C-alpha cells in the first residue's frame, strides 16, 4: 500500500500480543509501554508504505499520567515477512530503524502535561444542593402525575389513605384525663347488641374519634324517616339528583347537631376522670366537647370523601376495618385456649367453619341477587354488542334491580340504633333508659324475653332496606329516554315510572325479608356462642358486614373500570 492508502487501527488495553516477536522489540525500546499494558488507555496505530519499506507510527495515552507519547518505526519487507512467518526471533536480528519524535511532538506532550497539572490543581466547583432538590421534586412530580393519571389508582390511593387516617384518630387521646382512673368498660356498648361487630378494647378510651360514626348514622336514620313523612322532603326526594344533594346537606347539619349534643354529654360525664375537675370545669367541658365535635365531623368528612372519591361506601368500609382490627385480639384469645387441647376444640372449630361458609354464601346471595328487566332500543341497533372489545357485554340489554341495593347498611344502622339507648342509660342513669337497656339486652334475665329484641331487630333491618331516599325509578326512566330505550309492552313516561316503582318495591320487599332473616339468625348464633365461650366469640353479623363491604367494593371497582369504554360508547351514540 502507498502513503495515501494508510490504514488506521485502534486498540484498547493490550495492543500487541505477548507471544508476538515484535513485543520483545517494543519492550526493549520502550519498557514502560509494555510492562504495564493494561494501564494504557488507548493506542492508535498508523501503518503506511514508503519507498524504503514500511512505516508504523504509534500514539498512546496513559490512563494515570494523562500524557501522550508517540514514536515511529520504519521496517523493511524482510522484517514483515520474517515476523509473520516466525514465532520467535531475537531482537538483534531485526532490521528496524527507530525515528524519535520531533520537537513539535515533545512540546505538545509537555503542554498537555502542564495543562493536566493545572486542571488537577484547580479548586472543585460548588455543587448547588437546591438545584438537586428541584430536580428530585420534578422527578417525583412526574412520577406522581403518571401514577394518578389512572382513575382506578387515584381512587384506590384515596381510599387506602383515608382508611388509615380513620384508624389513627382512635389512638389520639384527649388531653386532661387521668386514664388510670377510667374503667375498662367506660362508654362501651354494655347491652351486647353490637358486641357481635367485634371487640374494640385495644382503642384508647376518650380518644379524638370517640364519637365515631354515631352522629352521622343517627342523622341518616332520622332523615330517612322524615323523607317519607314531611311533604316538603317527599317533594324534594322526587326531584332526582339535585334533591338528593340537598338531602345530603341536611344530613350533614343534623350530624353536626348530634355531634355537639353527644360531645357535651360525654364531656360533662367525664369530669370525674379529669385533672381539671376541681379548678376549671367549664374550660374542660368546652375544650373536650370542641375536640370531640372536630373528631366526629372529621369522620363524617372521611366517609363522604371515600364514598365520592374512593371505592365503596365510606361508613361500611370504616366499620369493616374496625371489625378486622378487633378480630386480632379475638384470634389471639382463641389460639391461646386451643393450643393445649386442640383435639377437644376440633369439633367446635369445624362447626364454626361450616357456619361461616353458610353465612358467607347467604351474604353473597343477598348482596348480588337482582331481578333483570329487559329493554328494547329504538334509537339505534346494538350491532356493537357482538364486536370484540365492546363495552356492552350482553347481547340482550336489561336493567338490574338488586334485592338489597344498600348492602349491609341496614344491619349497621339497626345495630347502632338499638345500642344508642344503652349508651345514654350508662351516661345519664335515667330509670326509663335503664329499663330500655334491659329490654334491648337479649342476654338479660330481668327484662323482656330474648324474642322481643330479635323481633325489633328484624323489623328495623327490614324497614331500613325498603327505604329509598333517592327517587330511583324516575331517574331510570329519564335515562332510558335519553338512551332511546324502552321496556317491552310498557309505554315511556309515567307508565314506565309506575312499572319500575312496582318492580323496585317487590324486589326490596323480598330482599328485606331475606336480609332480616339472615341478620337475625346471625345475631342469635352470636349470642349463643358468646354464652358458651366466655372471653371470645366470632361474630357472624360482622361476617355479613365484611362480606357485604368487600362485594360492594368489588362492584364499585368494576363500575369505574368499565367507565371509560362506556363513556366512549355513549358519546358515539350522542348520549
Curated annotation (Swiss-Prot):
Ubiquitous. GO terms for biological process: chloroplast organization; protein localization to chloroplast; protein transport; thylakoid membrane organization. The chain crosses the membrane at residues 157-177, 206-226, 251-271, 285-305, 306-326, 346-366, 414-434, 447-467, 509-529, 531-551. Pfam families: SecY. GO terms for cellular component: amyloplast membrane; chloroplast membrane; chloroplast thylakoid membrane; plastid envelope. It is a multi-pass membrane protein. It is found in: Plastid, Chloroplast membrane; Plastid, Amyloplast membrane; Plastid, Chloroplast thylakoid membrane. Keywords: Amyloplast, Chloroplast, Membrane, Plastid, Protein transport, Thylakoid, Transit peptide, Translocation, Transmembrane, Transmembrane helix, Transport. The keyword Membrane applies. SUPFAM superfamilies: Preprotein translocase SecY subunit. Its main location: plastid. Residues 1-34 form a transit peptide. InterPro entries: SecY/SEC61-alpha, SecY_dom_sf. Disruption phenotype: Embryo lethal. Cannot substitute for SCY1. Involved in protein export. Probably interacts with other proteins to allow the postimport or conservative sorting pathway for inner membrane proteins in plastids. Central subunit of the protein translocation channel SecYE. Consists of two halves formed by TMs 1-5 and 6-10. These two domains form a lateral gate at the front which open onto the bilayer between TMs 2 and 7, and are clamped together by SecE at the back. The channel is closed by both a pore ring composed of hydrophobic SecY resides and a short helix (helix 2A) on the extracellular side of the membrane which forms a plug. Part of a second Sec protein translocation apparatus. Interacts probably with SECA2. Belongs to the SecY/SEC61-alpha family. This is Preprotein translocase subunit SCY2, chloroplastic. It comes from Arabidopsis thaliana. The lineage of its organism: Eukaryota, Viridiplantae, Streptophyta, Embryophyta, Tracheophyta.
